[in-house]
Amino acid sequence: MKQNEPIIVKQLLNASIEQVWEALTNVVHMRKWYFDVIPNFEPRVGFKTQFLVSSGERNFTHNWSVTEVVPNLKICYHWTFNEYPGESISTFEISKKEEQTLLKVKSEIITDFPTDIPEFKRESGAAGWEYLIKESLPKFIEKSIKF
Protein backbone atom coordinates (compact mmCIF):
# COMPACT_ATOMS: atom_id res chain seq x y z
CA MET A 1 0.00 0.00 0.00
CA LYS A 2 1.14 3.47 -0.76
CA GLN A 3 0.75 6.84 0.87
CA ASN A 4 -2.49 7.97 -0.69
CA GLU A 5 -5.99 8.43 0.63
CA PRO A 6 -6.43 6.63 3.95
CA ILE A 7 -8.79 3.68 4.22
CA ILE A 8 -11.84 4.77 6.24
CA VAL A 9 -14.55 2.41 7.45
CA LYS A 10 -17.59 3.50 9.47
CA GLN A 11 -20.10 1.30 11.26
CA LEU A 12 -23.11 1.95 13.49
CA LEU A 13 -23.19 -0.51 16.38
CA ASN A 14 -26.05 -1.49 18.68
CA ALA A 15 -24.04 -1.02 21.84
CA SER A 16 -23.04 1.73 24.23
CA ILE A 17 -19.87 3.75 23.79
CA GLU A 18 -18.45 1.94 26.83
CA GLN A 19 -19.19 -1.49 25.34
CA VAL A 20 -17.58 -0.56 22.03
CA TRP A 21 -14.53 0.82 23.86
CA GLU A 22 -14.23 -2.47 25.77
CA ALA A 23 -14.44 -4.45 22.52
CA LEU A 24 -11.68 -2.26 21.03
CA THR A 25 -9.32 -2.25 24.01
CA ASN A 26 -9.86 -5.36 26.18
CA VAL A 27 -7.54 -8.08 24.88
CA VAL A 28 -9.96 -10.88 25.82
CA HIS A 29 -12.62 -9.29 23.60
CA MET A 30 -10.14 -8.29 20.86
CA ARG A 31 -9.13 -11.93 20.44
CA LYS A 32 -12.73 -12.83 19.61
CA TRP A 33 -13.28 -10.41 16.72
CA TYR A 34 -9.90 -8.92 15.72
CA PHE A 35 -6.81 -11.15 15.99
CA ASP A 36 -7.04 -14.27 18.14
CA VAL A 37 -3.26 -14.31 18.67
CA ILE A 38 -2.87 -10.91 20.34
CA PRO A 39 -0.82 -11.75 23.47
CA ASN A 40 -1.70 -8.60 25.39
CA PHE A 41 -3.03 -5.09 24.93
CA GLU A 42 -3.47 -2.00 27.07
CA PRO A 43 -5.10 1.28 26.04
CA ARG A 44 -2.10 3.26 27.29
CA VAL A 45 0.21 5.57 25.33
CA GLY A 46 3.55 3.84 24.86
CA PHE A 47 2.16 0.31 25.26
CA LYS A 48 3.66 -2.12 22.72
CA THR A 49 2.68 -5.60 21.62
CA GLN A 50 3.83 -8.02 18.95
CA PHE A 51 2.19 -11.08 17.39
CA LEU A 52 2.55 -13.32 14.35
CA VAL A 53 -0.12 -13.81 11.69
CA SER A 54 0.59 -16.24 8.85
CA SER A 55 -1.02 -15.97 5.43
CA GLY A 56 -0.17 -18.96 3.30
CA GLU A 57 3.59 -18.93 2.83
CA ARG A 58 4.09 -15.44 4.26
CA ASN A 59 4.49 -14.39 7.88
CA PHE A 60 3.47 -10.99 9.20
CA THR A 61 4.85 -10.16 12.63
CA HIS A 62 2.61 -7.29 13.73
CA ASN A 63 4.16 -4.60 15.91
CA TRP A 64 1.74 -2.18 17.53
CA SER A 65 2.64 0.85 19.62
CA VAL A 66 -0.20 2.88 21.15
CA THR A 67 0.28 6.56 20.29
CA GLU A 68 -2.92 8.24 21.52
CA VAL A 69 -5.69 7.38 23.96
CA VAL A 70 -8.81 9.34 24.87
CA PRO A 71 -10.87 6.86 26.93
CA ASN A 72 -14.24 6.00 25.38
CA LEU A 73 -13.52 8.26 22.39
CA LYS A 74 -10.30 7.48 20.50
CA ILE A 75 -7.30 5.17 20.32
CA CYS A 76 -4.45 5.21 17.79
CA TYR A 77 -1.58 2.87 17.23
CA HIS A 78 1.48 2.74 15.03
CA TRP A 79 1.63 -0.49 13.02
CA THR A 80 4.69 -2.13 11.42
CA PHE A 81 5.80 -5.64 10.42
CA ASN A 82 9.18 -7.26 11.13
CA GLU A 83 9.37 -8.90 7.71
CA TYR A 84 8.51 -5.91 5.52
CA PRO A 85 9.21 -2.19 5.28
CA GLY A 86 6.34 0.24 5.73
CA GLU A 87 4.34 1.71 8.55
CA SER A 88 0.82 2.89 9.21
CA ILE A 89 -1.32 4.50 11.88
CA SER A 90 -4.69 2.98 12.78
CA THR A 91 -7.19 5.31 14.45
CA PHE A 92 -10.43 4.17 16.08
CA GLU A 93 -12.94 6.91 16.98
CA ILE A 94 -16.27 6.32 18.69
CA SER A 95 -19.20 8.66 19.15
CA LYS A 96 -22.88 8.53 20.05
CA LYS A 97 -25.41 8.62 17.22
CA GLU A 98 -28.96 8.57 18.56
CA GLU A 99 -29.38 5.18 20.29
CA GLN A 100 -26.33 3.65 18.63
CA THR A 101 -22.57 4.10 18.65
CA LEU A 102 -20.69 5.16 15.54
CA LEU A 103 -17.24 3.67 15.04
CA LYS A 104 -14.91 5.26 12.50
CA VAL A 105 -11.66 3.47 11.68
CA LYS A 106 -8.94 5.13 9.64
CA SER A 107 -5.82 3.37 8.37
CA GLU A 108 -3.18 5.82 7.14
CA ILE A 109 0.01 4.73 5.43
CA ILE A 110 2.99 6.71 6.78
CA THR A 111 5.70 4.84 4.86
CA ASP A 112 4.85 2.72 1.81
CA PHE A 113 4.50 -1.05 2.13
CA PRO A 114 5.81 -3.30 -0.70
CA THR A 115 3.37 -3.34 -3.61
CA ASP A 116 4.41 -6.81 -4.77
CA ILE A 117 2.89 -8.46 -1.67
CA PRO A 118 -0.85 -9.17 -2.25
CA GLU A 119 -1.77 -8.48 1.39
CA PHE A 120 -0.39 -4.94 1.02
CA LYS A 121 -2.53 -4.01 -1.98
CA ARG A 122 -5.03 -1.27 -1.12
CA GLU A 123 -7.97 -3.51 -2.08
CA SER A 124 -6.78 -6.18 0.35
CA GLY A 125 -6.34 -3.67 3.17
CA ALA A 126 -9.76 -2.14 2.55
CA ALA A 127 -11.41 -5.57 2.40
CA GLY A 128 -9.74 -6.57 5.66
CA TRP A 129 -10.96 -3.48 7.51
CA GLU A 130 -14.44 -3.81 5.98
CA TYR A 131 -14.65 -7.40 7.22
CA LEU A 132 -13.37 -6.61 10.71
CA ILE A 133 -15.47 -3.49 11.31
CA LYS A 134 -18.66 -4.30 9.39
CA GLU A 135 -18.89 -8.07 10.01
CA SER A 136 -16.64 -9.47 12.72
CA LEU A 137 -17.05 -6.71 15.34
CA PRO A 138 -20.86 -6.36 14.98
CA LYS A 139 -21.29 -10.15 15.25
CA PHE A 140 -19.13 -10.19 18.37
CA ILE A 141 -21.13 -7.34 19.91
CA GLU A 142 -24.48 -8.97 19.09
CA LYS A 143 -23.38 -12.23 20.75
CA SER A 144 -21.67 -10.58 23.69
CA ILE A 145 -23.71 -7.45 24.39
CA LYS A 146 -23.46 -7.99 28.14
CA PHE A 147 -19.76 -8.82 28.19
Model-derived segments and spans:
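Extracellular beta-rich ligand/substrate-recognition surface
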Residues: M1-N4, L52-G56
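Hydrophobic ligand-binding cavity/cleft-lining segments
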Residues: M1-P39
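Residue-level preference for beta-strand/loop junctions
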Residues: N4-E5, V45, R58, G86
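Generic structural detector for well-ordered beta-strands
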Residues: I8-N14, E42, L52, S65, ...
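Hydrophobic pocket/interface hotspot
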Residues: V20-W21, M30, T49-F51, V66, ...
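A solvent-exposed, acidic/Ser-Thr-rich amphipathic alpha-helical stretch
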Residues: V37-F47
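Hydrophobic-ligand binding "helix-grip"
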Residues: N40, S55-L102, E108-D112
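A conserved amphipathic terminal alpha-helix motif
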Residues: I109-F147
